[in-house]
């Protein structure tokens, strides 16, 4: 992906005042930028007049940068440089790719000449602000009889899902990054019995189960019938599947599908994934 385009249409004065924007709007915007930079996406395109986008009922982005309160609000002092960079070069309208004679629409609304239309023309991703009608992914853009689905992000980690769907991110990297910092950790997974066992036929089930674990609290995980979370028992037939140190931590498992299972141990509220079982080999003996 050559870059990301900021969606000026996602700013319509939705932030109540300067403090609301600096405290609630720009921090999420910054987290999305960090995701892009971590993947090596360095170009942040925007329309040339983006500085004039209406962020609050009475202030544009330029106003927010130059207002006296920008020197007082802690978040403003922290993020001013981020916003300043966001309203500067590169501008996509220096070299527009959209057809000037075509009509681009979203939900029957004309968006020709906007960053939404440009993202469709360039096949790149949009970055939108929160609290707007553009909190959805994908954004479907029509150009006559032609329809284009434009990836759209407005909070952290969404970019990785879009890159994965576009085939620009491997399954292993997507899962590792997507679920990092939460209840799942894949840093200890076995190379032979790990990601290499996930294919096109079962990957959605794995991702759905990981997402479920991430969303539920531990009390709900333990009692959820779908996950069937339980202790895996050590015996003469099962002991060789894990090291003595891993057994001492207490091996657990949860269900991916009727046959597939995920094994690991829990430490400080994090499930460290060790391996998968796709043929009930482990489940049948422990």
Language-model regions, residue ranges each:
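Active-site beta-strand-loop-beta-strand hairpin of nuclease catalytic cores
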Residues: 260, 265-273
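Short, solvent-exposed loop/turn segments at secondary-structure junctions
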Residues: 259-261, 278-279
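Active-site-proximal segments of catalytic enzyme domains
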Residues: 214-253
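Compact nucleic-acid interaction/catalytic patches
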Residues: 106, 270-286
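An acidic, glycine-rich, mixed-charge low-complexity segment common to nucleic-acid enzymes
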Residues: 1-215, 221-225, 229
